[in-house]
Amino acid sequence: EIVIQHISAAEAVELVRQAKKKSTKIHAEATPHHFTLTEDAVMEHGTMAKMNPPLRTEADRQAIIRGLQDGTIDLIATDHAPHADYEKAKPLTEAPSGIIGLETSLALGNEALVDTGELTMMQLLTCMTINPAKLYRLDAGYLAENGPADLVLFDPAKEWVPERFYSKSQNSPFLGQKLKGKVEYTICKGKVIFEA
């Protein structure tokens, strides 16, 4: 199996699309920040929007969405990359690349893909849970009697503004931005480990 990670350019989406016609062992992954933001976010958020691969154009963002729609991109991953405040306070050329993404990922997918009609909620969840679990042969990504009780309870209509993250790091362009869709509970192995 080959996984092309962090797809960010229209050309990459097309290359993967062509490769998948020749092999069923090719998978591609995109991040929520690459299907929600463009390079303009760097002007607004500075180092908080510096990542690798970098944010690109609106045409690239739309190509990623089309790739998710047609199955060219079959995985969504957060690319959660925490950095200390002092690291992200450096000038843009010196600051490390990467943002945190775990706590905003489901809300961003909900808002940018489901609410806009680009994907159904089931398609979003398939890319975020079912497909990764199958690819990496994990006993996860499904609900069944006697199966692992690992899940979140999510309110897709609830609006919230992340003022602070539970992650030790706060490097996110979504800090202080209103998002739609809130995780209310996280359950791991049948135990509530997070409650909003």
Please describe what each predicted stretch is.
Residues 1-76:
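Histidine/acidic residue-rich metal-binding segments in metalloenzymes
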Residues 2, 29, 79, 109, ...:
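Residue-level signal for inorganic ion chemistry
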Residues 9, 33, 81-83, 158-159, ...:
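Short, glycine-/Ser/Thr-/acidic-enriched flexible segments
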Residues 12-13, 36, 84-86, 162, ...:
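Glycine/Thr-rich phosphate-binding loops of Rossmann-like dinucleotide-binding domains
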Residues 48, 69-70, 75-76, 81-157:
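His/Asp/Glu-enriched, well-ordered alpha-helical/loop segment
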Residues 49-59, 96-100, 173-179:
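A short acidic, glycine-rich active-site loop
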Residues 64-66, 141-142, 176:
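Short, flexible, glycine/charge-rich loop motifs used to bind or transfer phosphoryl groups or to couple energy/partner
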Residues 91-94, 148-195:
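C-terminal cap of metal-dependent C-N hydrolases
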